[in-house]
A protein has these predicted regions:
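Basic, Lys/Arg- and aromatic-enriched nucleic-acid-binding interface segment
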Residues: 2-60
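Conserved tyrosine-mediated DNA breakage-rejoining catalytic core shared by Y-recombinases
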Residues: 4-10, 65-105
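Active-site/catalytic core of tyrosine-dependent DNA strand-transfer enzymes
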Residues: 98-149
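Short, leucine-enriched amphipathic alpha-helices that occur as contiguous helical runs
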Residues: 27, 43-47, 131, 135, ...
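Short, charged phosphate-coordinating catalytic segments
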Residues: 1-2, 53-77, 174-176
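Catalytic-site neighborhood detector that most strongly recognizes the C-terminal catalytic loop/helix
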Residues: 87-89, 181-217
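C-terminal catalytic core of tyrosine-transesterase DNA break-rejoin enzymes
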Residues: 48-51, 55, 62, 137, ...
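Exposed loop/turn and edge beta-strand positions of beta-sandwich/beta-sheet ligand-binding modules
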Residues: 46, 77, 91, 148, ...
Length: 221
């Protein structure tokens, strides 16, 4: 299939002039690179931030604001984040996080943290936000790998997973995808009559796709 791994851009997205969506080959290049794995020891904050950006679609500031008490486990054993700091009302949500990430080392990373301070080291700087340092390092990461196709930034990871969940034949239905991504539901009928998914229901829908992404990048311990 010639279109496999390509971004499924709508006309609206193409004409918006916004950030581009990573293609699958670029994602594999980023997350299989030697530089990426070096960061697990050298800069674990960056390592886990971009990995979480890939599988949760969270915005930078949503991730950098997460505290230890926002990392939860449901009654059914599903792991998730409670997002309390987002730019929209729909962005305040509970997000499934694949258990594989915790097994991969993220749990040990969290266990070292104390109190209610953010689990990541990034702090707000006047006018720049806490994600500025992440964005700059991610730009250097792309430059190192010679990934220079237009406007590819950290937010492009969010666009990638949203696009991945939209696959025509095997994607996630509109309502749970909007809830996961923190998007407003545009259809008045759907928004009025849809009941919000519980975190366990949402995890059951989303986790298989997150696990598939982890498989595509061949995450190694």
């Amino acid at each position: 299939n010639p279109a496999e791994g390509k971004s499924l851009l709508t006309k609206k997205q193409k004409s918006s002039g916004g950030y581009l969506i990573f293609e699958l080959d670029e994602i594999k290049n980023i997350f299989k690179s030697e530089y990426f794995y070096e960061q697990k020891e050298q800069d674990p904050d960056y390592f886990y931030i971009i990995l979480l950006g890939l599988v949760t679609g969270c915005r930078i500031n949503e991730l950098t604001s997460i505290t230890k008490d926002q990392v939860k486990t449901s009654e059914n054993g599903n792991r998730f984040f409670v997002i309390r700091d987002s730019k929209t009302a729909a962005g305040l949500r509970e997000i499934p996080v694949p258990n594989k990430l915790f097994e991969f080392g993220f749990q040990k990373f969290i266990d070292k943290k104390t109190g209610n301070d953010p689990i990541f080291k990034y702090v707000n700087r006047a006018g720049k936000g806490s994600g500025n340092a992440v964005g700059k390092k991610f730009a250097r990461h792309l430059e190192l790998l010679k990934i220079n196709r237009g406007k590819l930034v950290f937010h492009s990871l969010r666009k990638f997973i949203n696009n991945f969940l939209m696959k025509k034949d095997s994607g996630v239905p509109y309502e749970p995808r909007c809830q996961f991504m923190g998007h407003e539901i545009e259809s008045v009928n759907v928004a009025t009559y849809t009941v919000e998914y519980s975190i366990d229901e949402l995890s059951e829908i989303i986790n298989p796709f997150q696990d598939k992404i982890i498989g595509l990048i061949d995450l190694k311990s």
